[in-house]
Amino acid sequence: WRLDVGDEISHFFWKRFRRAIKAVKKDMLIIGEIWHYAGDFLEGDEWDTVMNYPFYLNLIDLLADEKITVSQFIQNLGYLKGRLNKKCYPLMWNLIDSHDTARFLHLCNDNKKKQHLAAAFQLLLPGMPMIYYGDEFAMPGANDPDCRRGMYWDEEYQDKEMFEWYKQLLKVRKNHACIVEGEPLEIAARDGEETIVLTRKNDEETLALIFNCSSSARMFNEYAQKYDLLRENPFDGKIEGLDAAVIVL
């Protein structure tokens, strides 16, 4: 269940709603739409999670508007995580746009490399990715109602390179539980380089998730010759501008 504008209905109602839904199907997911802090709805007796608009807004500030640094981005997401029930954060619906916003690509002035990197954040950071239809083909769309235009089914208008990138991100996410469930070991956000490295570990493997938010290439020689899951090749130490890598340590 996705609950539109759910914060305009009382907590009393949602508590009763949850009891009724879970009585029918215990694993039914209850997702609220709310643009601001939603902790009071996520205490275990109302919703399971919400659409993660704070993630979206911070990603816009980082990549589209370039208003915050990579360390501010990480701090802001960490602050959100710290305020929420720890069981809710992995369920947060991470989005880069929706039926209520302009397409991410539009907000980036059609810079497809920025959407390329935004998709990596969306699919590799903790949370559940909510891919708005057409994003996987770099579909355009300004503010509502233009963002709700019909799906581009004609392959002539579909960006195949973007589609393959989404497929590869999803493949890596699906096949490596460490990305979803791994324990965070280290976060290195370097403002001067405009890079972020997140190290995660589970019982099976340790991964380094690398994000280059600069428009220029960056070197990560400490990971050279290790395996890059996104390229399915040994890593040469170089990440192009506005790109990402997932390295097996």
Predicted regions and their residues:
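Hydrophobic faces of well-ordered beta-strands that scaffold small-molecule active sites
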Residues: W1, I30-G32, M51, N94, ...
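Active-site-proximal substrate-binding groove within the catalytic cores of carbohydrate-active enzymes
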Residues: L80-I179
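Active-site-proximal helices and loops of the catalytic beta/alpha 8
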Residues: D4-K87, F121, P140-Q168, K201
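A conserved amphipathic helix/loop scaffold
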Residues: I68-V70, E181-P184, I210-N212, P234-F235
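C-terminal beta-strand-rich structural cap/linker in extracellular carbohydrate-active enzymes
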Residues: F235-L249
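Short, glycine-/Ser/Thr-/acidic-enriched flexible segments
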Residues: W35-H36, D100-T101, F137-A138, D203, ...
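Solvent-exposed beta-hairpin/edge-strand motifs
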Residues: Y223-N233
